[in-house]
């Protein structure tokens, strides 16, 4: 870990900060929810944090380069010295590996895929808003408590501040399913989803093996 920082402050004035922290060729350790599960580790090439005072407040930038985790950055300007605490900026992450989340979800047997996210940040520090796109490719999900194994999961979401559209597809066995819908969290959260599929494999050996068609709508 390398870094440097300069800071100054005076009565009646906002603090002035100029700091940078960089770490290279490190290892992240992830502990599982279940203590019996194996703890995983992942290497990263470089991670850095930069904080610098500007006329409008403070800029924060985070960069990550990690082939086994993902690459990307977040660059945000925030003014923490006024009541509203406004913020704006941008974020972009590419090839984020979903498997890094598996230790934090107890019911997941397998979780894989590549997640990409890019967009603009606005709003305030307490109520941030995001406008952007999210895409999942080559996903694979299997749950311990559910008799389905989802493969070739492809999911696209367009996020507009307080709502998001969802379009996706996946395989279960040789069957194909499509998922569409919207999620709105402006006031009370509302989820509207439609799942349609044919020849989907439902299997939990040795109890269940079945091929099903489905057309389900959810409005909650």
Where do the language-model regions lie?
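Interface amphipathic segments
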Residues: 1-215
């Amino acid at each position: 870990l390398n870094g440097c920082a300069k800071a100054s402050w005076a009565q009646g004035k906002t603090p002035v900060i100029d700091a940078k922290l960089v770490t290279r060729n490190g290892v992240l350790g992830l502990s599982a929810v279940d203590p019996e599960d194996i703890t995983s580790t992942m290497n990263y090439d470089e991670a850095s944090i930069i904080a610098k005072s500007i006329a409008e407040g403070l800029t924060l930038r985070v960069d990550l380069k990690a082939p086994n985790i993902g690459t990307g950055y977040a660059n945000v300007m925030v003014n923490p010295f006024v009541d509203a605490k406004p913020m704006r900026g941008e974020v972009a992450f590419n090839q984020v590996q979903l498997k890094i989340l598996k230790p934090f979800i107890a019911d997941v047997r397998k979780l894989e895929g590549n997640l990409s996210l890019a967009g603009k940040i606005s709003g305030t520090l307490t109520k941030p808003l995001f406008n952007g796109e999210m895409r999942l490719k080559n996903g694979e999900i299997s749950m311990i408590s559910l008799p389905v194994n989802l493969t070739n999961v492809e999911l696209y979401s367009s996020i507009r501040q307080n709502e998001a559209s969802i379009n996706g597809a996946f395989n279960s066995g040789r069957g194909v399913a499509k998922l569409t819908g919207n999620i709105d969290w402006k006031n009370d959260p509302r989820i509207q989803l439609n799942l349609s599929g044919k020849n989907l494999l439902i299997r939990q050996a040795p109890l269940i093996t079945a091929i099903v068609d489905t057309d389900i709508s959810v409005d909650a």
